[in-house]
């Protein structure tokens, strides 16, 4: 317990009502957020002579101040607690490292509805199906739907400006509602209804309707139509055979957990209308000494309550752990959803199978994660030995990418004790240098990165410079001139030159820009971590450069046309679905874009053609 914090005096002022408390250290940083049904009773438990765990002892030793917020109900306290955790990210709380919204399949409410992937707030008119665990699962489902039910997936800006059908129509992946006469309104509406039923888990209804239509077409001697419907029936059956489907039409999330060596994996199985849409593993940040019950309780609260704006709540949640606050959680989620949400911990039948599946996946993912962490730890230990350092807790690596000197981009990649720290990867657009001058580019990015105040925890132990002696010389010169409040002599600067024929395993390392370098054996773990971070940096630089080059390519042609400014350029690209759509458009189609006159449309048309 902190000597400066008077616990007895503080506890005399605390109420016995429900609420939330925030604990601060000497630097004024929030180090823990908690909730309580009885604030006085809960906070008193921190200042007993025999504390429950080492984690609590370490926490209490740093307390300098405690702020209390009283709430009317336990539900309000629970919601506020998770909002504070998300805001402050306290180091003694279990933290869910997941800020991405989940994707849905969106069926629009247009006259001719379209299918698309959607993330974020649901403002657009239409129906949303999901959530799916990731974008890949949505794209895979959309590709499958396009083969079975050929309704459009194009943007409205493209759809409204077509005079002839696109390639998707030619290969049978779209019915072509953009062009009058290609498909009847009834047929298109029928296919949309099939999609709606299919995504709602009502595959049997789809098959029943298709079989009835096939038999009717056959009776009317419309054999080509009957054959087309037969093929569609076979396609639907092939799809449903591959899916793990429950007969009960469940709408639930299943949460399994595994905990070992201070690391936790929580695996969530998403089931909607009886279909497993996919699953996802999470590795929350767990402070030392945290018990499994706290991990599960905090994860579930953060997973649903922090992401409430983006996450669709199922009717039921199956848990692999019996929570002490299960009723409170269910009540809070029900209040949030405006309907009853059940939280179940001892399911039977199919639900028990689901839970076993989630538990198995959590254990498998945790074993894999621990194995990866063991490997990166071994490699960093080997690197520290080679470089004669006590430890390598943080590394940063730089690379430069450009095309013939144009659109130069520098990348900075960060590794910590757990490997790639992608949240801290950065790209820098390099300007004001002679095109193709990689030395000047490296000089600029290092000054921008290190010529400012840096938190002590973010000072790297090793800075890897991809490029060999010359680039290392630039780095040494930059650091010699730095005037910063942190210890600029702490990072070890290490140059890496590619081997002969740029083959992996033949790299040469340099401590100084003059003299001979040294090489490591191809099977050296230290070399493997150097190759890993260098390849990450190279890929990060190239992907950034490609994005920048594509952006310039898509806009520079239009910028040269007199009368086309930023707003008109944006309008043209939006209505034509991109530069390629604009290149393929006629003068009449271009003139339909708001703000584009007939004369300007002709000028744009001929400029793009020539």
Curated annotation (Swiss-Prot):
Single biological process term from Gene Ontology: SOS response
Record keywords: Cytoplasm, DNA damage, DNA excision, DNA repair, Excision nuclease, SOS response
GO CC terms of this entry: cytoplasm; excinuclease repair complex
SUPFAM superfamilies (alphabetical): C-terminal UvrC-binding domain of UvrB (SSF46600), GIY-YIG endonuclease (SSF82771), RuvA domain 2-like (SSF47781)
Function per UniProt: The UvrABC repair system catalyzes the recognition and processing of DNA lesions. UvrC both incises the 5' and 3' sides of the lesion. The N-terminal half is responsible for the 3' incision and the C-terminal half is responsible for the 5' incision.
Superkingdom of the organism of origin: Bacteria
Pfam families: GIY-YIG, HHH_5, UVR, UvrC_RNaseH, UvrC_RNaseH_dom
GO molecular function: DNA binding; excinuclease ABC activity
Span of domain UVR: 204-239
Annotated PROSITE patterns: GIY_YIG, UVR, UVRC
Source organism: Citrobacter koseri (strain ATCC BAA-895 / CDC 4225-83 / SGSC4696)
Taxonomy of the source species: Bacteria, Pseudomonadati, Pseudomonadota, Gammaproteobacteria, Enterobacterales
Annotated family: Belongs to the UvrC family.
Location within or outside the cell: Cytoplasm
Gene3D superfamilies assigned: 5' to 3' exonuclease, C-terminal subdomain (1.10.150.20), GIY-YIG endonuclease (3.40.1440.10), UVR domain (4.10.860.10), UvrC, RNAse H endonuclease domain (3.30.420.340)
Start and end residues of each GIY-YIG domain: 16-94
GN (gene name): uvrC
Principal location class: cytoplasm
Stated name of the protein: UvrABC system protein C
């Amino acid at each position: 317990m902190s000597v400066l914090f008077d616990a007895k005096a503080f506890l005399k002022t605390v109420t016995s009502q429900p609420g939330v408390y925030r604990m601060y250290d000497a630097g004024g940083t929030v180090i823990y957020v908690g909730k309580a049904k009885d604030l006085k009773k809960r906070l008193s438990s921190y200042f007993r002579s025999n504390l429950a765990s080492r984690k609590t002892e370490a926490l209490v030793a740093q307390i300098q101040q405690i702020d209390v917020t009283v709430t009317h109900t336990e539900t309000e306290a629970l919601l506020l607690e998770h909002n504070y955790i998300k805001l402050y990210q306290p180091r003694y709380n279990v933290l869910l490292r997941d800020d991405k919204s989940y994707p849905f399949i969106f069926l629009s409410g247009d006259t001719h509805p379209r299918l698309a992937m959607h993330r974020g707030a649901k403002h657009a008119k239409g129906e949303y199906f999901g959530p799916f665990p990731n974008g890949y699962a949505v794209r895979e489902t959309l590709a499958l739907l396009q083969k079975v039910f050929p309704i459009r997936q194009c943007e409205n800006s493209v759809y409204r400006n077509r005079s002839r059908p696109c390639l998707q129509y030619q290969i049978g992946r779209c019915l072509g509602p953009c062009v009058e006469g290609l498909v009847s309104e009834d047929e298109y509406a029928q296919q949309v209804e099939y999609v709606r039923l299919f995504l709602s888990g009502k595959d049997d209804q789809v098959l029943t309707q298709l079989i009835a239509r096939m038999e009717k077409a056959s009776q009317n001697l419309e054999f080509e139509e009957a054959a087309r419907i037969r093929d569609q029936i076979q396609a639907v059956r092939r799809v449903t055979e591959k899916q793990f489907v429950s007969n009960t039409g469940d709408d639930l999330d299943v949460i399994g957990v595994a905990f070992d060596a201070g690391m936790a994996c929580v695996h969530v199985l998403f089931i909607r209308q009886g279909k497993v849409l996919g699953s996802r593993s999470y590795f929350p940040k767990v402070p030392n000494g945290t018990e499994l019950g706290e991990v599960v309780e905090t994860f579930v609260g953060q997973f649903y309550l922090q992401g409430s704006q983006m996450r669709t709540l199922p009717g039921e949640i199956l848990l692999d752990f019996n929570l002490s606050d299960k009723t409170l959680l269910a009540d809070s989620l029900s209040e949030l959803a405006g309907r009853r949400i059940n939280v179940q911990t001892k399911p039977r039948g199919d639900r028990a199978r689901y839970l076993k599946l989630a538990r198995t996946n959590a254990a498998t993912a945790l074993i894999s994660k621990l194995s990866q962490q063991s490997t990166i730890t071994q490699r960093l230990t080997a690197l520290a030995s080679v470089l004669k350092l006590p430890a390598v807790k943080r590394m940063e690596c730089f690379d430069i990418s450009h095309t013939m000197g144009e659109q130069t981009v520098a990348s900075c990649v960060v590794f910590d004790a757990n490997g790639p720290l992608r949240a801290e990867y950065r790209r820098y657009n390099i300007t004001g240098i002679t095109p193709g001058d990689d030395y000047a580019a490296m000089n600029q990015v290092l000054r921008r990165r290190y010529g400012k105040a840096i938190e002590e925890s973010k000072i790297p132990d090793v800075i890897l410079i991809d490029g060999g002696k010359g680039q290392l010389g630039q780095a040494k010169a930059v650091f010699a001139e730095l005037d910063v409040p942190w210890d600029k002599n702490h990072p070890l600067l290490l140059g890496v030159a590619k081997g002969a024929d740029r083959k992996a395993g033949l790299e040469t390392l340099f401590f100084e820009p003059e003299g001979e370098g040294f090489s490591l054996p191809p099977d050296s773990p230290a070399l493997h971590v150097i190759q890993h971070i260098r390849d990450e940096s190279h890929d990060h630089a190239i992907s950034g450069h490609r994005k920048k080059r594509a952006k310039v390519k898509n806009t520079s042609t239009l910028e040269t046309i007199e009368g086309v400014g930023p707003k008109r350029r944006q309008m043209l690209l939006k209505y034509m679905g991109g530069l390629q759509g604009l290149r393929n458009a006629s003068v009449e189609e271009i003139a339909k874009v708001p703000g584009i006159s007939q004369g300007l449309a002709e000028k744009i048309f001929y400029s793009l053609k020539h």
